[in-house]
């Protein structure tokens, strides 16, 4: 498969992040900032900012927040043809609590992106994509779970499939056995799997092997990342920065990882890891989930030039 100059499509949740301005419990916080969010949307924006054609397939409500999200994606040069408006369900909203080392989330599930059906899928986008990216959140409810899994199974072998574990246990409360089955199936379908160190430990304790058929990327927080291809394991140290907001760091990492796979000749794990770590670190210097730095900001770094420079 010739990946150069291809398009990366993401499928899944597009929502509003309401991020607490001050640290503390949600019940005590008074002020929130509105930001666009949803892991696949964050990745789609990151891919576009890194100079690669990017599309998002999702569903929002026919409401002001839905309009806002589509407008913001368009400003980021993300193809929005795959975003459908739901006449019955509202646009998703997530409250983000900044407390301690990493944010926590309060997410509601009776929303538009969990109501995706096969009739909502733009197959022109799916068939054009060299890489199709999805995560676990969209799989937590039907009909979206069935829809996304059918899409992924249909394109298996014709496009690279990337899966971000992105585990949100609260969403699966009362259906833990089903969650394990869904995650295991998704991992087995994926060529590229990304997970945090904590997610890997959790799933391995449940008997699930976290391994992409082509590449496995494990984020290690302040320690950097571990990339695994077949029997080759490369640990790549992180960049030392003072984080302002880590909300979108994992998604920035994923965007950089996918762009690197698309652009690098041969899968150079060290170059790929350095680039993804750099992008993730710089993303923590901005507030909000759409914090991936732009290509022109990155070209002053050798690690970025090795991937992004023509």
Swiss-Prot record:
A molecular-function term among this protein's GO annotations: ATP binding
Keywords: ATP-binding, Kinase, Nucleotide-binding, Transferase
GO BP terms: fructose metabolic process
Amino-acid positions noted as binding ATP in the UniProt annotation, renumbered to this chain: 194, 219, 224
Record keyword Transferase present: yes
Enzyme Commission number(s) of this protein: 2.7.1.-
EC top class, as a word: transferase
Entry keyword Cytoplasm: no
Entry similarity comment: Belongs to the carbohydrate kinase PfkB family.
UniProt name for this protein: Putative sugar kinase PH1459
């Amino acid at each position: 498969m010739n990946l150069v100059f291809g398009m990366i499509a993401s499928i899944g949740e597009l929502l509003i992040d309401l991020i607490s301005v001050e640290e503390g419990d949600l019940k005590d916080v008074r002020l929130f900032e509105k930001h666009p969010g949803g892991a696949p949307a964050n990745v789609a924006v990151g891919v576009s900012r890194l100079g690669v054609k990017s599309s998002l397939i999702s569903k929002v409500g026919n409401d002001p927040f839905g309009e806002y999200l589509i407008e913001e994606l368009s400003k980021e040069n993300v193809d929005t043809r795959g975003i459908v408006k739901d006449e019955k369900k509202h646009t998703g909203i997530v409250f983000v609590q900044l407390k301690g080392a990493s944010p926590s989330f309060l997410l509601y599930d009776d929303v538009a992106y969990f109501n995706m059906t096969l009739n909502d899928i733009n197959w022109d986008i799916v068939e054009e994509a060299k890489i199709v990216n999805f995560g676990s959140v969209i799989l937590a409810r039907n009909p979206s779970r069935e829809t996304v899994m059918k899409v992924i199974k249909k394109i298996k072998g014709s496009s690279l499939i990337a899966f971000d574990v992105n585990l949100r246990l609260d969403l699966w409360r009362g259906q833990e056995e089903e969650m394990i089955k869904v995650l295991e199936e998704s991992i087995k379908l994926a060529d590229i799997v990304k997970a945090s160190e904590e997610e890997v430990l959790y799933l391995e304790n449940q008997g699930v092997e976290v391994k992409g058929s082509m590449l496995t990327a494990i984020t290690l927080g302040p320690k950097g990342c571990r990339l695994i291809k077949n029997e080759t394991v490369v640990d790549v140290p992180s960049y030392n920065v003072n984080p302002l907001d880590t909300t979108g760091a994992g998604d920035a990492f994923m965007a950089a990882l996918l762009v690197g796979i698309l652009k690098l000749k041969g899968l150079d794990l060290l170059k790929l890891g350095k680039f993804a770590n750099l992008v993730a670190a710089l993303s923590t210097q901005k507030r909000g989930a759409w914090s991936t730095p732009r290509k022109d900001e990155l070209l002053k770094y050798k690690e970025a030039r090795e991937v992004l420079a023509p």
